[in-house]
C-alpha cells in the first residue's frame, strides 16, 4: 500500500474504500459487511463513509465489519483510518456534536480519525470548525 505524507508528517493510505450506496438496503447488509471485511483483508487501511450514506446505514456496515475484523484477525484499530462526514444541515456547533456522537455509535468507535463537512451549507463555517 502506498502512503501520502501530510504536511503534519502523518501518513495516510493513498487508496481507500468508499462506502457510498452501502447501508441503503437491509437485504444487502451481509454482502456489504463482507465486502468491507474483504477490503480490510486485502490491505485497505482507509475507509470513507458519511452520515448521509444509507441514512447512517453505511456507517453501521463499516462499524460491524471493522469490529469483526478486529476480533477475528490481527488488525488493530490504530492501523485503520476512518473518515466520515457531517451533513450541512447538521453543521451548527451543537449539530456537529450530536451528529458526531451518532456516527461514533454507528461506527462502534470512540474516535473518528478525519471528520469532514460533506459540503458547505448555511451554517457559519466558524461554528462548524469550533465543534
Each language-model region and where it sits:
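Glycine/proline-rich, positively charged
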Residues: 41, 88-131
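N-terminal binding-site loop/beta-alpha segment at the start of enzyme catalytic domains
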Residues: 1-80
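Residue-level recognition of the N-termini of beta-strands and the immediately preceding loop/turn
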Residues: 78-82, 112-114
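Active-site beta-loop-alpha junctions enriched in small/polar residues
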Residues: 20-22, 50-52, 85-89, 117-120
Amino acid at each position: 500500500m502506498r502512503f501520502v505524507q501530510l504536511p503534519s508528517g502523518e501518513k495516510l493510505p493513498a487508496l481507500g474504500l468508499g462506502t457510498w450506496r452501502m447501508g441503503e438496503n437491509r437485504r444487502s447488509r451481509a454482502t456489504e459487511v463482507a465486502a468491507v471485511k474483504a477490503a480490510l483483508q486485502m490491505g485497505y487501511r482507509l475507509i470513507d463513509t458519511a452520515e448521509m450514506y444509507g441514512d447512517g446505514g453505511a456507517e453501521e456496515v463499516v462499524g460491524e465489519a471493522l469490529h469483526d475484523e478486529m476480533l477475528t484477525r490481527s488488525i488493530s484499530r490504530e492501523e485503520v483510518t476512518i473518515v466520515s462526514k457531517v451533513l450541512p444541515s447538521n453543521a451548527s456547533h451543537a449539530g456537529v456534536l450530536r451528529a458526531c456522537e451518532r456516527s461514533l455509535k454507528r461506527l462502534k468507535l470512540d474516535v473518528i480519525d478525519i471528520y469532514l463537512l460533506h459540503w458547505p451549507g448555511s451554517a457559519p463555517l466558524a461554528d462548524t470548525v469550533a465543534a
